[in-house]
């Protein structure tokens, strides 16, 4: 399971948030784990953002000052071809891919940067536009 709209920015490039071997783990535990990982870089209790999780399907969650709820799928596909690295030394920030209906308010920790990128790619009748 991976986040498709939130990434770490590092000295070597962009890094995915991925949790492996998730077959026997419930989704709420995994979402809490992603939020726990993010809490190292942002103030969860002061921030509002969306987590888009991809396993076999895409699921949307909203984290509002630490309170997590599932929200309706808006058919954004998050399919931009992005480059990722596996090896890095230093995390410099967190990147959020947002849409017109997914506003965010992020309070960073320890001088980490917050980067936001906007997408509008939606799934329409079998096509990614």
From Swiss-Prot:
It is found in: Virion. It comes from Variola virus (isolate Human/India/Ind3/1967). Keywords: Virion. Its main location: virion. Disulfide bonds: none annotated. This is Core protein OPG073. Belongs to the orthopoxvirus OPG073 family. GO terms for cellular component: virion component. Induction: Expressed in the intermediate phase of the viral replicative cycle. The gene is OPG073. InterPro entries: Virion_core (IPR009201).
């Amino acid at each position: 399971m991976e986040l498709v709209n939130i990434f770490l920015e590092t000295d070597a490039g962009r890094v995915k948030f991925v949790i492996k071997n998730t077959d026997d783990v419930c989704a709420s535990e995994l979402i809490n784990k992603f939020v726990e990982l993010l809490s190292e870089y942002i103030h969860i209790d002061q921030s509002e953002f969306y987590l888009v999780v991809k396993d076999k399907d895409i699921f949307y969650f909203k984290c509002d000052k630490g309170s997590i709820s599932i929200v309706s799928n808006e058919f954004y596909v998050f399919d931009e071809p992005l480059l990722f690295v596996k090896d890095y030394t230093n995390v410099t920030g967190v990147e959020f891919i947002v849409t017109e209906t997914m506003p965010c308010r992020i309070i960073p920790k320890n001088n980490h940067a917050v980067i936001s990128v906007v997408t509008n790619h939606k799934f329409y009748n079998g096509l990614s536009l």
